[in-house]
């Protein structure tokens, strides 16, 4: 089941839709954002991307819509393949879809006992269980520290390393039992969310794909085109903000001879747009 899209009106309005323009929905999912964009198109075209094959079931029967079952990091190649050199607007709603979280067998949530899979693209090989059972102590430390921002990372990794010498860690219930001694009692859900986030990001190469997508979007958009990105955690947010403000991922502001900041994007909204109280309650 796919839930109501986040910031639906704000994000689609942010694209400043030209009824005859070319638009990209890089995270099609349940198709909520795409359906709203299609309502505002006349003779334009919308290309929807989603690497998750489950999204195929939601593709609208609309001649103006083209579905691409691949990662959004290759957006320019597919834009050209569809017959277009430039796009008028690009929308990306990052992170995991509600469907992926709620499907127990996908392994994205610690609410269910399931195989630790966590692949957004079911055709890819690397699973979370591969990471837990084959990664070195150094690499496990890196992903939980950098992608999960876990405080007691050494204790966490030590528990995993010890457990896997006796038995492979393959399911959520097993994993939760292994790491239980280092989970803070008062912050259990937050801690587990950070741990699962770290594994998911590594499995799917999310941050690398995000950087590739932003560079591709910069080159694919026509002058005056719009890019709308919805982020959910500080790692995504930092990458997007740095790139849009400075033109690079380090956030280093470079200026030309006249003192003008060298970047290709002009910020339309200076302040962050957040969901309304009504939307949060839904």
Model-derived regions, located:
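S-adenosyl-L-methionine-dependent methyltransferase catalytic core, i.e., the SAM/SAH-binding region
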Residues: 1-282
């Amino acid at each position: 089941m796919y839930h109501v899209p986040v910031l639906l009106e704000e994000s689609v309005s942010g694209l400043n839709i030209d009824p005859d323009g070319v638009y990209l929905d890089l995270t099609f999912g349940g198709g909520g954002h795409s359906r709203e964009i299609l309502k505002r198109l006349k003779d334009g075209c919308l290309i929807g991307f989603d690497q998750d094959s489950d999204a195929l079931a939601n593709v609208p029967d609309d001649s103006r819509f083209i579905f691409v079952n691949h990662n959004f990091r290759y957006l320019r190649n597919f834009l050209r393949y569809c017959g277009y050199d430039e796009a008028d607007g690009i929308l990306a709603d990052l992170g995991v879809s509600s469907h992926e979280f709620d499907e127990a067998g996908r392994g994205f949530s610690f609410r269910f006992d399931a195989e630790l899979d966590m692949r957004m693209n079911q055709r890819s090989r690397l699973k979370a269980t591969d990471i837990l059972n084959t990664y070195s102590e150094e690499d496990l430390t890196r992903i939980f520290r950098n992608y999960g921002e876990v405080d007691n990372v050494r204790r966490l990794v030590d528990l995993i390393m010890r457990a896997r010498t006796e038995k492979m860690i393959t399911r959520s219930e097993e994993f939760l039992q292994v790491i239980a001694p280092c989970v803070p009692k008062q912050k259990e859900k937050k801690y587990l969310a950070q741990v699962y986030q770290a594994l998911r990001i590594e499995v799917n190469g999310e941050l690398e794909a995000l950087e590739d997508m932003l560079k591709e979007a910069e080159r694919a958009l026509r002058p005056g085109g719009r890019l709308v990105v919805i982020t959910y955690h500080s790692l995504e947010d930092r990458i997007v903000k740095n790139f849009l403000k400075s033109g690079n991922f380090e956030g280093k502001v470079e200026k030309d001879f006249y003192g003008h900041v060298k970047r290709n994007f002009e910020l339309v909204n200076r302040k962050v747009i957040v969901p309304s109280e009504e939307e949060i309650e839904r």
